[in-house]
Amino acid sequence: MLEQEKIIEHLDAVFRDMESRLNGRAGSLLHNFHKASFEALRSTHFPDRKHEDWRYTPVQRLISPKYKLAEKKQQYNISEIQELDAFKIPVINGHVILDGVDAALKSAGVIIRPLQEAMQISSPENNSTRWLHKVMNTSNQAFELLNFAFHPGGILIEIPKNLSLSKPIEIQIIHDDPDISFSHPIYFI
């Protein structure tokens, strides 16, 4: 079996595992986006040394590990990270912890929505859905499709026009999963 086929076979098992965890979200816009991305990935080859942009990158070493889905932590502790005076949005193992978002950020007028919820909004101003569909329809890049197929979600951060915040927004990305896993959410700001 060719290396590419072995990798797709493994990713297929991971994708089925991801679908088994949807808990009522099967058929949602986000799930359909994952499926379309994975189907496109099946027919797209990963680059190799013959591709100029990837000549010096050991692509096989990047894609050959047995990736799994990142586990969502129920409890987290980020107090060990040196403090920056900022509004904080914690992301642990690729999952945005909405309960951990600084309440002052929300009260300042910033709207933070999970990507799943943001995709449900039908509006011409819905940049997340418009951008995702545009990129999905034009992408033939294997790594881009891989990220789209396996991202654990993401967030849309809406900052009203002319809003001035007293401090920056810090997205705290923490990965403590001991296994090699997919933990790359999509952010729209």
Language-model segments: residues:
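Glycine-rich and polybasic anion-binding loops at the starts of cofactor/ligand-binding domains
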Residues: 1-189
